[in-house]
Amino acid sequence: MSAVMITRKITRKWEKLPGKNTFCCDGRVMMARQKGVFYLTLFLIVGTCSLFFAFECPYLAVHLSPAIPVFAVLLFVFVMAMLLRTSFSDPGVLPRALPEEANFIEMEIEAANGNVLAGQRPPPRIKNVQINNQIVKLKYCYTCKIFRPPRASHCSICDNCVDRFDHHCPWVGNCVGKRNYRYFYLFTLSLSLLTIYIFAFDIVHVVLRSVDSGFVNTLKETPGTVLEVLVCFFTLWSVVGLTGFHTYLISLNQTTNEDIKGSWSGKNRVQNPYSHKNIIKNCCEVLCGPTYPSVLDRRGLMLEDSCSSAPSNGATTVPVNKSSNPATQTTKSSAPLIPNEHTPDEAKPSICSGTQKSSSSPKEEKPSSPISPNAVAPAVIKESTH
């Protein structure tokens, strides 16, 4: 016969979270799996700024002002801080329903919809809530098994429901939602200023050197400047345009997802219930509102059970604690922190209880040598065969 050995290992909850995210630094850093475009963003920003600091800043600091490279460094540090803050943070992922919660929601839906005849299409799973005298529909997510809160949506790339979902941005390698939208906007705004700043002083650098060396010779002597001008020129339009678009959305207290779907415009002409009808109030709510905590317990602890079989002569070995008096010691095992829902209730106390109800009672092996009171000795439970 064989014995079943059950081992329990303490793990972090982020290791078992569903979805298509990657975690680093013991769950503190959260990103999407597709990070190739994010690395390209880092390369373009760091590479362009490095060329600017190496070639233009020394010349401009001597001929114009030493404040030029200082301001460029401060702006570069702010851009990188906002980028990493956007990329590495939880955008507002909503936890999926537990099996018990999902079953309860299913029972509520069946009770509300009644019996659906065979062949009929079931009604849509929607709840209506009222926000500022406006009816807003809460849609049911078949993946997360929850009714999504207002303005939440399911990201198909990260496979998670995100609160106040704006869009999934591959350039930052993460979703943009309730918890990192302001940092995303500050990143695009500061990156626009940095791009304009570098582009302008690249032109100034070329003009100043052309006075002494000529325009053609200057271009030959400064190939790094030419490369910076090209990168900044083609980047400027997209970054500045993106910043302007999000400035427009913030003034209306609207998300990119709502703008694409036409939630508050179009034929119905439904008013936006989240807008304060004031640009300043909308901007203050989006950019200066409170920072919401993450609802994902990423670094929480959980027990993971793993079973393995080992050859045994009709006995199962279970670790127990030995008391100071071996003669009065009963067979015990530590109770699990997280009970196994697949274990029947009548089978759970078979080892943990002090008295056994079955006919075959556990027998304890006596140690051949004296041991300390805190030592752990195996208790052998014989399996009855008929």
Swiss-Prot record:
InterPro entries: Palmitoyltrfase_DHHC (IPR001594), PFA4/ZDH16/20/ERF2-like (IPR039859)
Membrane topology: Multi-pass membrane protein
Catalysed reaction equations from the record: L-cysteinyl-[protein] + hexadecanoyl-CoA = S-hexadecanoyl-L-cysteinyl-[protein] + CoA
EC main group: transferase
Residues spanning the membrane: 36-56, 64-84, 184-204, 225-245
Gene Ontology terms: cellular component: endoplasmic reticulum; endoplasmic reticulum membrane; Golgi apparatus; Golgi membrane
EC number annotated for this UniProt entry: 2.3.1.225
UniProt topological domain (Lumenal) ranges: 57-63, 205-224
Location within or outside the cell: Endoplasmic reticulum membrane; Golgi apparatus membrane
Acyltransferase listed as a keyword: yes
UniProt GO molecular function: protein-cysteine S-palmitoyltransferase activity
Residue spans, topological domain Cytoplasmic: 1-35, 85-183, 246-386
Keyword annotations of the record: Acyltransferase, Endoplasmic reticulum, Golgi apparatus, Lipoprotein, Membrane, Palmitate, Transferase, Transmembrane, Transmembrane helix
Broad class of where this protein is predominantly found: endoplasmic reticulum
Record has Disulfide bond as a keyword: no
Residue span(s) of domain DHHC: 139-189
Family the UniProt entry places it in: Belongs to the DHHC palmitoyltransferase family. ERF2/ZDHHC9 subfamily.
Domain remark in the UniProt entry: The DHHC domain is required for palmitoyltransferase activity.
Annotated protein name in UniProt: Palmitoyltransferase ZDHHC9
GN (gene name): zdhhc9
